Every structure is written in structure tokens, then in C-alpha cells.
Swiss-Prot record:
The keyword Repeat does not apply. Belongs to the GARS family. Binds 1 Mg(2+) or Mn(2+) ion per subunit. It comes from Xylella fastidiosa (strain Temecula1 / ATCC 700964). This is Phosphoribosylamine--glycine ligase. SUPFAM superfamilies: Glutathione synthetase ATP-binding domain-like, PreATP-grasp domain, Rudiment single hybrid motif. It catalyses: 5-phospho-beta-D-ribosylamine + glycine + ATP = N(1)-(5-phospho-beta-D-ribosyl)glycinamide + ADP + phosphate + H(+). Keywords: ATP-binding, Ligase, Magnesium, Manganese, Metal-binding, Nucleotide-binding, Purine biosynthesis. It holds the Pfam family GARS_A. Its cofactor is Mg(2+); Mn(2+). ATP binds at residues 135-196. It is an enzyme of class 6 (ligase). Residues 109-316 form the ATP-grasp domain.
Length: 430
């Protein structure tokens, strides 16, 4: 079977790596891919960008692709699934209408309010003065979100009213996020611990994937600006069996049912970013309509089932007939980034050490490319995700950072504390 995977990040490299394990997969085309997917078994890159929907469809048709899997949110929100389905091509992901769960935070908040899905109190504004008046009335801390897609960076957790006002002006007047910031969502600040809860959905049924926890802030101790994610581990210990059941009952299943009721049934990876309070009550911080990045990398390290089998079950509406099997050992991934990410990174630097990695480490490429000499060079902000399994999170962290120590380029940096919450729990249990 020939597959097309759309995207160029660490998430796509991890999906491709896992799909290539399937005996039924003969070849995977990755568009546009990166230096890691270019050298992965059964894989080759195609130079078609994720925003070129016509080019991607033409590629899939020319190559007689059996199934297409979409990694990033941009083509999903742009309607790539609608485009492929209209041409009779099998593709796994939500339609443009269903992808509004991520494409518009205001849409997602209204959807949750309409269907009784627990989330933070909120208000939507397009006027600067009205938004600032709202913030002054509520006080800080408070959360300011750009309505549209902003590559994971359109959320400001303002600890003061002054900071909140500046964020509002940047988004609504200063064009900080372009069209994505033409409308803002102001939310109450939620206390608790975050977790990523990702499910495969076939339109009617949801199959939960392994839980995970991301590290959004750029610096150790969870300080500094938000990023697309600086590392993740799986499973998330905060999600106990009881909380897991509650998330399915109160959030995932009502979301799937609500999308059907609204006439926009959801198929694809449904990502619920959660806040779990001290009482174990989950609330939705955000919905994404695709697998998380970097959560995909440690989650795929643990998946023992054939990913192609699961995707086919979803395409056939049969997710209620399958189960996903997981390695019981935790996994952890450390993102190595290029300074001064999340600002515009320095690119084109040669990465050394990729051929001298410990055997227990898997490196998933994100912002990488091959130069004219065939060397792997940096090509983005988040460059690599160094991932490993362990008997516990402490060991997985040790293995992953052992891999990080082998890799070098001039402007590399990474957090040194990925997994700290889980490790603190492990030490407390002892």
C-alpha cells in the first residue's frame, strides 16, 4: 500500500516512522518532508508545500496513493480533506467545517458552551476598548488568545492587567498575528496541571491514544514565551484511570456527538488540551484537529499496534471494533531548537552527531533540510526531537538527554527539565 503523509515537522516524521513499520506499507511519500523523512525506511520526500492543495491532490493522483494522512492544521483548515474527498481519494482528517474547532478559538468556545463541555469562562472581542474594559473588570491573571491559527504562539497568559492590555493592542491594533488576531478570546485563568488527551475519531466513535504532557514555555521552570512545544512525555501521570474515564464521558464523547448534531461530523485526530484541577476535574483549554507536536513523538514510541490498521478502521467507521496496544514504559522527547526561537531562528547550520547516537534513542527531525553537499542543516525553529523510552520517566529523561549531548550545531538550545512534573511525582512516591 502506498501512503502520502502531508507535513514537514517532527510530528510527521514520527507518524511516517510508525507507519513504515506496517508490513502492508510499500512506500510513503512525504510532502514536503524534512531531512529525517528523506532518509527513513520506505520513504521519499516530494517538494510540494502543505498549502498547495491542488499540488498535493495532483501528487496523490499521479502516485496512485491509497491513503493520505494530514499532519499539520493549516491544510486541514484550508479544506484539503474536502478537496481530496471530492476527487474520490481516501484521506484521514477533518473537513474544513469540522477543522474550525482549531481554526477559530471563538468557534470552539461557542461549540463547548452550546454542548455543555467544561471549559473556562470567556468573551470574544473585535474592539480594543471593549476588550480592555473587559480585562480591567476581570483583573489578572487572565488569558488572551488570538482567534485564528498562530502556530501555537497566539496565547498570552497575562499575569498583570498591563500585560493583558498590551497583548490585546498587539493582536487587535498592532496586527501581531495578522488575520488570526483580528478577533480575540479573553478567558479566565485556570489553575491546575495541563495534559494532552488525543483520540482517533471516525465520525461516530473515539479511540483514545496514550496521554501525554507538553512543555509550552521556552525556558526551564516553565517561564518565558509560549512556543509550539519544547518537549513532551507519555503517559501523563495526572490522568488517572478515573480522570481518563471522566474525560471520555464529559469531553471527548460529547464533542464527537456535538459535531454530529451540528452537521459537521469529525474524523481525524482530536486533540483536547486539558487543565486538571486539584479535585481531578478536567476542563478544555483548547481543541486541535491533529496530533500534537511534540506529543506525537513520545506517543508513537509507545504505540505497539499497527498505525495503518487503526487509520483504516477509522476510515471505515470501525474504531469501536479495535483497540490500541501500548508499551507500558514511559517515553520522553526533548526538543532541540535554534536560537533565538520562538523569534525568527538562525538557519543553515550543519548538525553534527546524528551518526553517533546511543542505540536507545530515536531522533525525529522537524526544522531540518539537506544542503547541496547532502549534510543535515537547520531549517526552522524547532529542529529535532530526541526521544527515548525508560523504565520510568527519570530513566527516559536520562536516555533522551544522553542523545541530546551527542548532537551539536552553533545556535542549538533546549530545556534541561523536560518531564520535571512526572519525575517529581516519582520521587514523591518513593
Amino acid at each position: 500500500m502506498k501512503l502520502l503523509v502531508i507535513g514537514s515537522g517532527g510530528r510527521e516524521h514520527a507518524l511516517v516512522w510508525k507507519l513504515a513499520h506496517s508490513r502492508r506499507v510499500s512506500e510513503i511519500i512525504v510532502a514536503p518532508g524534512n531531512a529525517g523523512t528523506a532518509t527513513e525506511t520506505k520513504c521519499r520526500n516530494a517538494p510540494v508545500q502543505v498549502t498547495d492543495l491542488d499540488g498535493l491532490l495532483a501528487l496523490a493522483q499521479r502516485e496512485a496513493v491509497n491513503i493520505t494522512v494530514v499532519g499539520p492544521e493549516v491544510p486541514l483548515v484550508a479544506g484539503i480533506v474536502d478537496c481530496f474527498r471530492a476527487a474520490g481519494m481516501r484521506i484521514f482528517g477533518p473537513t474544513a467545517a469540522a477543522a474550525q474547532l482549531e481554526g477559530s478559538k471563538a468557534y470552539a468556545k461557542d461549540f463547548m458552551a452550546r454542548h455543555g463541555i467544561p471549559t473556562a469562562r470567556y468573551a470574544v472581542h473585535t474592539n480594543v476598548d471593549a476588550a480592555i474594559s473587559d480585562v480591567r473588570q476581570q483583573g489578572a491573571p487572565i488569558v488572551i488568545k488570538a482567534d485564528g491559527l498562530a502556530a501555537g504562539k497566539g496565547v498570552i497568559v497575562a499575569m498583570t492587567v498591563t500585560e493583558a492590555e498590551a497583548a490585546i493592542r498587539d493582536m487587535l491594533s498592532g496586527n501581531a498575528f495578522g488575520h488570526a488576531g483580528a478577533r480575540v478570546v479573553i478567558e479566565e485563568y485556570l489553575d491546575g496541571e495541563e495534559a494532552s488527551f488525543i483520540s482517533m475519531v471516525d465520525g461516530t466513535h473515539a479511540l483514545p491514544m496514550a496521554t501525554s504532557q507538553d512543555h509550552k514555555r521556552v525556558s526551564d521552570g516553565d517561564i518565558g514565551p509560549n512556543t509550539g512545544g519544547m518537549g513532551a512525555y507519555s503517559p501523563a501521570p495526572i490522568i488517572t484511570d478515573e480522570i481518563h474515564a471522566r474525560v471520555m464521558r464529559e469531553i471527548v464523547n460529547p464533542t464527537v456527538a456535538g459535531m454530529i448534531a451540528d452537521g459537521t461530523p469529525f474524523m481525524g485526530f482530536l486533540y483536547a488540551g486539558l487543565m486538571i484541577d486539584v479535585h481531578g476535574a478536567p476542563k478544555v483549554i483548547e481543541f486541535n484537529v491533529r496530533f500534537g507536536d511534540p506529543e506525537t513523538q513520545p506517543v508513537m514510541m509507545r504505540l505497539q499496534s499497527d498505525l495503518l490498521d487503526l487509520i483504516e478502521a477509522a476510515l471505515n467507521g470501525d474504531l469501536d471494533k479495535v483497540q490500541a496496544q501500548w508499551d507500558p514504559h514511559p517515553s520522553l522527547g526533548v526538543v532541540m531548537a535554534a536560537r533565538p526561537y520562538p523569534e525568527m531562528p538562525i538557519t543553515g547550520e550543519v548538525i553534527s552527531g546524528l551518526d553517533a547516537l546511543p542505540a536507545n534513542v530515536k531522533v525525529f527531525h522537524a526544522g531540518t533540510a539537506l544542503d547541496v553537499a547532502g549534510r543535515v542543516v537547520t531549517a526552522g525553529g524547532r529542529v529535532l526531537c530526541v526521544t527515548a523510552l525508560g523504565s520510568n520517566v527519570s530513566e527516559a529523561q536520562r536516555h533522551a538527554y544522553g542523545g541530546v549531548a551527542s548532537l551539536h550545531w552553533a545556535n542549538a538550545f533546549q530545556r534541561s527539565d523536560i518531564g520535571w512534573r512526572a519525575i517529581m511525582r516519582e520521587h514523591t512516591v518513593r
